[in-house]
Amino acid sequence: MRKSSLDARRMKAIGAGLVTGLALSMIVSAAQAQTRQGGRAPLVLADEGTFYAGGHYDQDHPARHIVGQVFVEYRIPADLKHPFPIVLVHGGNQSGSGWFSTPDGRPGWAQYFLRQGYAIYVVDQVARGRSAVVPEAYGSVATAQPLQYVLEKFTSQERYKLWPQASLHTQWPGKAEPGDPAFDQYWSSDIPGMQNRTLQAQMNIDALAALFDRIGPAILLVHSQSGAYAWPLAQARPDLVKAIVAAEPAGPPVHDVVVQSAQVFDTPWEKAIKQTDDDYYRDNPGVKPYGLTSTPLAYTPPVTAASPLQFVHQDKPERRDLARCWRQAEPARKLVAVGDRPILVVEAEASFYAGYNHCNVEYLEQAGVHTTFIRLADIGIHGNGHMMMMEKNSDEIAQVMVDWLDKVVGPMEAKQR
């Protein structure tokens, strides 16, 4: 039963004196809540709830579990200002909880978008968080990320300097080390996903398509790993995915890359770069057969076994601190339907993605997909790592996304004219 129904029944059952007392209590509670939220007025919701989207009965194992479903938590603000909700899909080793609060206890992007008048739908990816894990159907769980890896890549890269931009990192809250309350909160949220990444991706794409079928047209916000779901989902539901906001989406195209200083020399990048004339970034040998993804993408002309995509490597990087990009051999095939909506890619200044986010954008553009690319440093937002939604200036970054959405999608009133 919803809270509004309970309140209505209670109000009918009490007298005028109790109503007055209740009103005073609500005023005090609201003031206390505003104090807890740093002076912000309490969030007022018109509706909230949870459900599961997608999934099917597993016919391959005796237990016949439902598999492939995602858990969804939704909240609709009382002051709804925008026609399309935002679907937030977390990245690797995370769950939807990371959208609701930062490790140091501030409201997260979910609350920020709610306060701007957006309804939100927050997903736990298949086999993560509150989406059930069914080992016989999903296979092995990936090995957990080592603590040292997380320190080097996500929270304290400025100490290790394993890629050119790492030393610019300043925005992680707290000391970014074990025992620090904010770091311990973040490390507590780490959840490994499936070992089979292609299966994981396809299950999530299918479940997200079912979610859009249920809720109707919406904006898709992805981060990191889930960025690879955005392009096939846009093709699967071309009329429902109204815009894509991609915070450092999975990449780069064709090959993942490794950083030589971390993998070869195990030294800070300034020293490593002096020891080789080779590329600073090296390609992982694995190939993404559809360029941006390992899961199928529709191209024109079509990709077939007899006519696969052909790729070429950029002769030299645009700068020494950037990776050389892989592109399609010309004439490039075009991605079907992906470019039929506004797309934003956001890059954080000190992230390990800062060396190759541009490769995703260039690949999309070559395939006929116009993309807005915002390097946060270019607009005066400095010091962020890959987990930008958890860092000290997270609200400032969310506002960049809101401003862009206001331009390309617009508020409710504009859609009603």
Which residues fall in each region the model found?
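Short beta-strand element of the alpha/beta-hydrolase
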Residues: 82-91
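Conserved acidic catalytic loop of the alpha/beta-hydrolase fold
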Residues: 171-173, 177-182, 188-191, 196-219
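Gly/Ala-rich beta-loop-alpha elbow adjacent to hydrolase catalytic centers
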Residues: 221-230
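N-terminal cap/lid segment of alpha/beta-hydrolase-fold proteins
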Residues: 35-81
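Short beta-strand/loop motif that positions the catalytic acidic residue
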Residues: 339, 345-347
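Conserved alpha/beta-hydrolase
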Residues: 106-133
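Short substrate-entry loop that stabilizes the transition state in hydrolases
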Residues: 92-104, 110, 129-130, 253-254, ...
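Catalytic active-site module of serine/aspartate enzymes centered on a nucleophile-bearing elbow/loop
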Residues: 381-383, 387-417
